[in-house]
Each structure stands twice: as C-alpha cells, then as structure tokens.
Swiss-Prot record:
Keywords on record: Membrane, Transferase, Transmembrane, Transmembrane helix
Native organism: Penicillium shearii (Eupenicillium shearii)
Biotechnology: Shearone derivatives produced by this cluster are interesting candidates for Alzheimer's disease (AD) therapy since they moderately inhibit aggregation of amyloid beta 42 (Abeta42).
Class of this enzyme: transferase
Subcellular location: Membrane
Protein name: Polyprenyl transferase esdpC
Principal location listed in the UniProt entry: membrane
Entries under InterPro entries matching the protein: Prenyltransferase, UbiA_prenyltransferase, UbiA_prenylTrfase_CS, UbiA_sf
Pathway(s) this gene product operates in, as recorded in its UniProt entry: Secondary metabolite biosynthesis; terpenoid biosynthesis
Transmembrane segments annotated in the record for this chain: 35-54, 73-93, 118-138, 140-160, 171-191, 202-222, 239-259, 307-327
Gene Ontology biological-process entries: terpenoid biosynthetic process
Summary of the function given for this chain in its UniProt record: olyprenyl transferase; part of the cluster that mediates the biosynthesis of shearones, diterpenoid pyrones (DPs) which are structurally diverse meroterpenoids consisting of a diterpene linked by a pyrone, and which may exhibit a range of bioactivities.
GO terms of molecular function: transferase activity, transferring alkyl or aryl (other than methyl) groups
Pfam families named in the record: UbiA (PF01040)
Name of encoding gene: esdpC
Length: 327
C-alpha cells in the first residue's frame, strides 16, 4: 500500500524555511490556490437554497430569505474547509503514486516541501473546524449523520485507486461522487432538519444527490483521463480503464444520467425558471463538451473539468434566483 510513515519525510525538507513558506505550502496542499475545493461546496449550497425555496412555498412566512442565505454560506464554508482536509489526506495516502505522475509530483508532500507531521496537523485542524461549523449550522441536530458518511467516503477515496478495488470493479470515482453528493442532505438538514425526520430530508434531497454523484463521475472521469499514461505506470485504478476505447460513449452515458437525475429534482421543485436556467444550460453545455472531447487527446478532459466548474457556479446563481422568486 502506497502510504508514508508518519515519521518519515517524503524527501528532504529545506533547511531554511520561513513561516510564510510553510503557510503557502499548506495552502497549496489543501488546493486553496485552485478552484477544485469549490466543487465540494456546490451540492450543499444548491440543496440549502432549493430547500429554502421549497419551505417558503409549503409554509409561507416561516423562514426568511436572509436566514436561507446565511445557512447556505455556513454550509459553503464548512464544505470548503472539509474538502481542504480531504485533499491533505488524499496526498498523504497517495504520496508514492504522486511522485510518479507528472501532474502531481510537485505537490508539497510529494516534492518534500513539508513533513507528514505538519500535513496531518493541518488536516486535523481543518477537519475539526468543519465539524464545528456544520454542528453550528445544524444547531446540534443530526451532526453525526451529516459528518460520518462523508468522513468515511473521504478516507476510502484514495484507497479506491488500489488494485484490490480494481478486482471488484469498484472505482475511486464512486467514493468521490458520494463525498461530493451527500452534502445535499446536509443542505436540506440546514433548512428542514428540525421540521422533519432525517429520512424525509434524505428522500427529498436524493435526486439532487444522485445528480451530483453522476455529475462527479462524468467530470472526474474526463479530468483524470489526462493522467492515463502516468496512471498506467503506477497501476492506478480508475473507471476510465473500464471504459477503455469506449470512453467517449461512456461519458455520453454519464451525461445522460446527470440530466435524468436533474429532471427528477426539478420536477419536485416545480419551477419553470430552473428548467430553463439549469437543465437547458447543462444540456447545451454537455453537448458542446462531448463534441470536443477526444480519446486520442487526453488533455481535452482538463477543459471539460473547468467548464463543469463554471456550470456549478452558474447553478448557485440559478438556485439563488429561485429562492428570491419564492420570496
């Protein structure tokens, strides 16, 4: 198993290093210098806004628009910090793999700019902070149910790249999809957690969670495909190896699943605005992305990833407008 010892340095840590250098490397280790952690916030924020709009329809005057936006902000910050902790965990477990892949070998741990101890202390600080924020957001209700599932899936994600999971046809994208999709439950709990049971909140957010799960499979498969040569050398398990030469058709299939699950959620919301601003925009974007993806050019997957991030940001706006329309 490719895992570093807690007391072993990945390489030699520079002898002269300022506190600013350490802070910068920890910032980069959590990917806070990139847009990637924001992907972990979309599901929870969308869910919070949609649940707020739904509650304003079912119980007019029972909840203010300002409160919903405040809860959405708390869910956003909690998810962002949690993702930072998950990035550190992933890099620690994948240390030896990252050294062999061109895109990852200069990450702070793989490059030896920080020690394992420093990384793990940073990881735990972020995890504790995210737990506190979610507990505060949910007013102490269903905190374990909100945090434990995503914690387990985050822990298992890097191990999903190992040969054991490959033998049972289980891929890391499944863990990642769950980790990024389950916060839809947290977002729903942030609005309706004290009004209805956990089971009801899960059921109402299930279609949205499925949307995000399949969306993550789609965008991560396209994105990680650019590492196919390095992953072959490192014997990394990934779902695009299952697709093989049919990778393009596989992405089309995943895009169809995303749109299907989205349709179920929007049907429950009963909003003409969301049908146009969400489903239509996503459908057009997927068609454009898939027309440009090439199995012969793995780097084309990187562009798809960025465009899907833009879709996520746009959908935050669409859900915010939906809330305002119901106010």
């Amino acid at each position: 198993m490719a895992k570093a010892s807690l007391d072993t340095l990945p390489r030699s840590v520079p002898q002269k290093r300022t506190a600013g250098d350490l802070a910068k490397d920890l910032f980069v280790l959590s990917r806070f210098n990139r847009y990637n952690p924001l992907l972990a916030t979309f599901s929870g924020v969308w869910a919070t806004l949609l649940a707020g709009a739904s509650k304003r329809i079912d119980h007019p005057g029972s909840i203010s628009t300002e409160y919903v936006f405040k809860q959405a902000l708390l869910v956003f910050v909690g998810g962002y910090i949690f993702c930072g902790a998950g990035m550190v965990w992933n890099d620690w477990i994948d240390l030896n793999i990252d050294k062999q892949v061109a895109r990852t070998k200069e990450r702070p741990l793989a490059a030896g700019r920080i020690t394992n101890t420093e990384a793990l202390i940073w990881m735990m600080a972020q995890y504790i902070a995210s737990w506190y924020l979610i507990a505060y957001t949910l007013d102490g209700h269903n905190v374990l149910e909100a945090m434990i599932p995503v914690t387990i899936s985050t822990i298992l994600y890097p191990f999903g790249k190992r040969s054991f999971f490959k033998t049972i046809y289980f891929y890391p994208q499944y863990f990642l999809g769950f980790t990024l999709g389950y916060p839809s439950v947290i977002g729903w709990l942030a609005i309706k957690g004290q009004d209805q049971s956990l089971q009801d909140n899960i059921m109402e957010s299930f279609a949205l969670g499925t949307t995000v799960f399949t969306w993550v499979l789609y965008l991560n498969t396209a994105y990680s495909y650019q590492d196919i040569e390095g992953d072959k050398k490192a014997n990394v398990n990934s779902v695009y190896f299952l697709a093989g030469s049919y990778i393009h058709y596989f992405l089309v299939f995943l895009a169809a699943l995303v749109l299907g699950a989205t349709s179920l959620q929007l049907k429950a919301q009963a909003s003409q605005w969301l049908w146009g601003s969400w489903l239509s925009v996503w459908g057009y974007s997927f068609a454009s992305q898939l027309s440009r993806f090439s199995a012969k050019d793995p780097s084309s997957g990187g562009t798809l990833h960025k465009e899907n991030f833009a879709l996520g940001v746009w959908t935050v706006f669409a859900c915010a407008v939906e809330l305002l329309l119901k106010s």
